[in-house]
Amino acid sequence: MAAAGARRSPGRGLGLRGRPRLGFHPGPPPPPPPPLLLLFLLLLPPPPLLAGATAAAASREPDSPCRLKTVTVSTLPALRESDIGWSGARTGAAAGAGAGTGAGAGAAAAAASAASPGSAGSAGTAAESRLLLFVRNELPGRIAVQDDLDNTELPFFTLEMSGTAADISLVHWRQQWLENGTLYFHVSMSSSGQLAQATAPTLQEPSEIVEEQMHILHISVMGGLIALLLLLLVFTVALYAQRRWQKRRRIPQKSASTEATHEIHYIPSVLLGPQARESFRSSRLQTHNSVIGVPIRETPILDDYDYEEEEEPPRRANHVSREDEFGSQMTHALDSLGRPGEEKVEFEKKAAAEATQETVESLMQKFKESFRANTPVEIGQLQPASRSSTSAGKRKRRNKSRGGISFGRTKGTSGSEADDETQLTFYTEQYRSRRRSKGLLKSPVNKTALTLIAVSSCILAMVCGNQMSCPLTVKVTLHVPEHFIADGSSFVVSEGSYLDISDWLNPAKLSLYYQINATSPWVRDLCGQRTTDACEQLCDPDTGECSCHEGYAPDPVHRHLCVRSDWGQSEGPWPYTTLERGYDLVTGEQAPEKILRSTFSLGQGLWLPVSKSFVVPPVELSINPLASCKTDVLVTEDPADVREEAMLSTYFETINDLLSSFGPVRDCSRNNGGCTRNFKCVSDRQVDSSGCVCPEELKPMKDGSGCYDHSKGIDCSDGFNGGCEQLCLQQTLPLPYDTTSSTIFMFCGCVEEYKLAPDGKSCLMLSDVCEGPKCLKPDSKFNDTLFGEMLHGYNNRTQHVNQGQVFQMTFRENNFIKDFPQLADGLLVIPLPVEEQCRGVLSEPLPDLQLLTGDIRYDEAMGYPMVQQWRVRSNLYRVKLSTITLSAGFTNVLKILTKESSRDELLSFIQHYGSHYIAEALYGSELTCIIHFPSKKVQQQLWLQYQKETTELGSKKELKSMPFITYLSGLLTAQMLSDDQLISGVEIRCEEKGRCPSTCHLCRRPGKEQLSPTPVLLEINRVVPLYTLIQDNGTKEAFKNALMSSYWCSGKGDVIDDWCRCDLSAFDASGLPNCSPLPQPVLRLSPTVEPSSTVVSLEWVDVQPAIGTKVSDYILQHKKVDEYTDTDLYTGEFLSFADDLLSGLGTSCVAAGRSHGEVPEVSIYSVIFKCLEPDGLYKFTLYAVDTRGRHSELSTVTLRTACPLVDDNKAEEIADKIYNLYNGYTSGKEQQTAYNTLMEVSASMLFRVQHHYNSHYEKFGDFVWRSEDELGPRKAHLILRRLERVSSHCSSLLRSAYIQSRVDTIPYLFCRSEEVRPAGMVWYSILKDTKITCEEKMVSMARNTYGETKGR
């Protein structure tokens, strides 16, 4: 598919590249010196000539000769003329029969005969929606095909005509439906006579004639002024030549020191000090917008040498924005490294002096040695040059620097020939001096004369550029649905143009022709029409067959691709562990999940610090060990660019496909491929594999002699005899799940007269071993479980004590404490004072956060659900480690670990022993009870009732000793329910750690008392990392790295600064690194701001960890739904927290805030919605977006807003007014007054009016009956129908005895970002680093208070 996306040149020798720029775009001239300002103003045309490439290009300035006109041509008229339907198009027609005229008729017939069999045999129903096309463009300009329409849209043509107004008026196009079922579209040039006959004169022609006359006059004036200016310049130059010719004629001489200084012009950055590199890098950084990567050029050290930039300025300008946008971490191509071309050929012809040769060789030697010493070096990419090829489909390659990969080909050489070229070339003074003409007389023209000449040349070029005529070009763009064009469709382009299918995702088999002019015969481009399988290297223009360069062979499956057949002395494992899969940083999708093919030079190599192996860099690849860009990949490719350059390079789907192209790594057909013991021979190449691999679930031994199961045995080759005291034995056993493979089982043994001890590693003398009833029993008073957690490892991430014992448990010292047996040595146990024992603590009532997210049942009359915690601690002991003695098992494992240990070995150690050990902890017993209240109102009423009933009567009013939890438990047990059923929704959930002593009355329970219970671990006060027990600094650093990887990168990547560099295996299905997962944010109602009828405040805790994933933005979605079972057909409104809310670009109804939680490092973001509808069901959704474009899982809050506000006093007044109007005889005017009054109030107010009317005047008749009697059935129905809008929840609240209105004023932090994010950024910025200014404001929230009695 990638090869189908490349744009190709249609004819032999046609090499147009890129999209042609239609329209004339003169730039502003450079500012001249003040003496020439008047003359410069005279030469300028009166109006400014600006011809930008805008959408309204047809409205050019009148003095500009260029015009740009865009015409859209619909295919609907041609389709209507046909006798077939839209969905049943015939596909068995020829593609060009009858369309060509003159010399092209024969070629059209040939196209028809070639296309008819393929198109008639379209497969099944897919061919019914396809259409044969025949597009012919006789004018210069390309034909583009884009499948950007839906299947229900009609195709159409777009013509972009660029040229003079007269030329554009001669462009003619027509479309028709041919008899054979082909849609024919033809663009041609009409003559002036035909145009005059076919087109009536318009009102614009006289004005254009006047403009043409003024244009000729302007040209004449300009020509005269230019001639005068040139005459003055010649006279000035002659005067200066006469005056200064005799003054300075001596030849400048140079000293030996100067020549030595100029001996070498460029020194690679590796030979510079780190300060010099950083200073030069910072100076270059000021001219770029990218915060990720900065291009670094080699540093010139000449003082009097004029350094010339040899890059192509237009090409560089076109791509600077893309490089800054993608934040490329690779450097640009260096002018001083490996530049092919004429300078290199000339340099190789002329040999330098012997001293110069020695200097260069010494520099090269130092340069290579610095690589071997892991010195950070940057190797620049090669400048790609145009290469000659016999393939008519290949064009010049655009010089880009994307992600540090550049597929440059030297002129006249193939990919294999580039392997032998020298990568580094140093230019010496002897070579550079050819440009300066040593020994000649100094020019007599000084700076003033040069300035005059430069300014005159600029003015002359500008004036001549203004008068240049614009050639006529017509770009034809065909917009079609996907899978629309049938096989056999034909395209005819003029010579110098091409067919652009770069955006065509599903190309068909085409016939492509080109012609020199309208009457010349058509020439078929067999190479250009290979859209689905374009040739990778060479293409025969006569037959269209693909071939390969020397050293390459056609792929056995895909014949249009080439694989390398000659690799020289390439043996051993593939070393590129740092090349990872590319992905699209913009969309966050795997586009493409490719590994690019490169050519390699075996003559050079370098050491990569990150891979710990010697690698051979590709010719076109820049390996930059200094790159510390915060991205998980070193290769990033844009999908469009990959398709465009498929002719110069191809790719493989996976890295295994790339490695397989190198051929087998071993011959496994005989002698197990040379693999020893139980290694298995694998002929396929793999990353960092020599072909000898271990069976599944086994790992190699330390010395690499065999494979063993590290979970069931020891390693005798670890350098410490496997931890055995005497013998370490090995045994080869077959694997139970694979009889063809085996494992090496290793265990400890003892020599004669010794026996293996119970620990399995040490040995005991047989004379010291006592067995039988006569032997003394060991002392059973030792307690090896009390405070045992202090001797084991602890995982600080999972908060669990591990099974592995770190410290040895001995009982040599008399370590006793009251009521306990002898304790292990090294434990210091301190009982806490009596005042801290048996203390009950009741927390403040807080909103239940677990019930403020998801599907929320909120009652504004009762308030938030609340929660309180009751905790009692007793039998408390503070335990510390006074002295430590490492256990034998832990000591043996530490001996095995080295700085070369793999991350998996260290992670296995952490999994068994943990990451820390406990240095200080609190032991005892604890009773914790959580009290859940259904609402805030219930909690307040129960607390008031508790205070009232547990207080003695009298003036002192001292509280009794009964705790609140005991009082509530008594209510729940005895079911002492009050009139308002307060206790019905209260729940108490308790959890006990250890046993409560009988001396504590707050936690003891009948029948479960214990005088001196065993204390358990309650709280860990201080932990110490295990790596502090490691002596070797290298091993300690490796353990730290593995520990950080397990903490932040899931053990599948390395921590670099504050981000994770994922392994090759830590990529998800979409190609994005997932070793540092993006947590799910939890959206909830703000616990401090309860919702009202129109205002809802939401908040969430920032999920960005300290290391790893970086959150770029949070996306909020809110919509109003009818029921909880929403079908999600209405998506609602999406808001970006960073771009819409913090920037202030959103609506005034939504505001953003930010605050800090109990821990300052934790940020809490909040959003307040102000313009919601009362009694409406709303659904709010939140997800996070990281800097790679990944989305987290959704968090949802569904909530019904509070009931509408009502004025109870006004409702009662309206009820009285309606009663007075209904009372007695009701005239027509009174009826209308009553009707208008009831229709003007809201539905909730009408419900409240009905409540007051019935409560006061129901004895005179119900409100419904009285309204029907007084107003009539029709008007009464219109009024009473509005009561149906009130929900059942609000109708129950509106029946309350009293409703009071109040306004709560709540402080809220309104935040705005100080910086503006630039539009179209590819690299997402980090939200936490955004500078935010917050201002505290008061938010007024009107509420209703419902009750059975009037509030105070």
Swiss-Prot record:
Its main location: membrane. Disulfide bonds join C527-C539, C535-C546, C548-C562, C668-C681, C675-C692, C694-C707, C716-C728, C724-C748, C750-C763, C838-C1000, C929-C990, C996-C1003, C1049-C1060, C1062-C1075, C1149-C1171, C1203-C1290, C1311-C1334. Residues 383-392 have a biased composition (Polar residues). The gene is Astn2. Detected in cerebellum granule neurons; not detected in astroglia (at protein level). Detected primarily in cerebellum, and at lower levels in brain cortex, olfactory bulb, hindbrain and hippocampus dentate gyrus. Between 6 and 10 days after birth, when granule cell migration occurs in the cerebellum, detected in granule cell precursors in the external germinal layer, the molecular layer, the internal granule layer and in Purkinje neurons. Detected in postmitotic neurons in adult cerebellum. Keywords: Calcium, Cytoplasm, Cytoplasmic vesicle, Disulfide bond, EGF-like domain, Endosome, Glycoprotein, Membrane, Metal-binding, Protein transport, Repeat, Signal, Transmembrane, Transmembrane helix, Transport. Residues 240-447 are cytoplasmic. This is Astrotactin-2.
